[in-house]
Amino acid sequence: AKLSEQAERYDDMAASMKAVTELGAELSNEERNLLSVAYKNVVGARRSSWRVISSIEQKTEGNDKRQQMAREYREKVETELQDICKDVLDLLDRFLVPNATPPESKVFYLKMKGDYYRYLSEVASGDSKQETVASSQQAYQEAFEISKSEMQPTHPIRLGLALNFSVFYYEILNSPEKACSLAKSAFDEAIRELDTLNEESYKDSTLIMQLLRDNLTLWTSENQGEEADNVEGDN
């Protein structure tokens, strides 16, 4: 898996880490991060493609042939994206969440569950969208409650969860006030306890705090109604 990462062959890396996960033992922190990086890159490529193709599809209105080609290609990418998300969610439900012992592992995997349901909801419609949105919110909320009671406000996993949960509120639920409130609370609580940061996680934590602040600036700016690429990070 490490070799695949160095070669940037993320599909191979994901397949390796899926096989490791299916052995059924609790993953080490390093294995957990390799799994996360692999699937984040695999699904990220499809999410980017889907956005580009959807934009092209909208621009080809009035040109039936080109629009049909764009729609068929979008549906192909959509199926790939859905299959990847379902793979990850299956691993989370069957192995990762049930086997997670430390609170930080439980939060990490529940956050991941929220993320992959969120990715599904981006391409879903109708009842399917409602279900994926509800599942995403439920996973994020459960992770959020554990993180508040069991982890320091400066912990990079807790901060990463707050970042992605706030993006969920902004992009998926269209609730800018809730998104800003959540991001601001996470940032302010971390700032107050900055002196508790250990050297090991200082870089990760401060990077996510910067992303939280960037999103807050973007969301509260005068241009908040305009389409903008929201900064989003996973840890």
UniProtKB/Swiss-Prot annotation:
Q: What does this protein do?
A: Adapter protein implicated in the regulation of a large spectrum of both general and specialized signaling pathways. Binds to a large number of partners, usually by recognition of a phosphoserine or phosphothreonine motif. Binding generally results in the modulation of the activity of the binding partner.
**Signal peptide start-end:** none
Native source species: Xenopus laevis (African clawed frog)
On the tree of life, the source organism's domain of life is Eukaryota
Name the SMART domains on file: 14_3_3
Q: Which family does it belong to?
A: Belongs to the 14-3-3 family.
GO terms, biological process: protein localization; signal transduction
Protein name per the record:
14-3-3-like protein
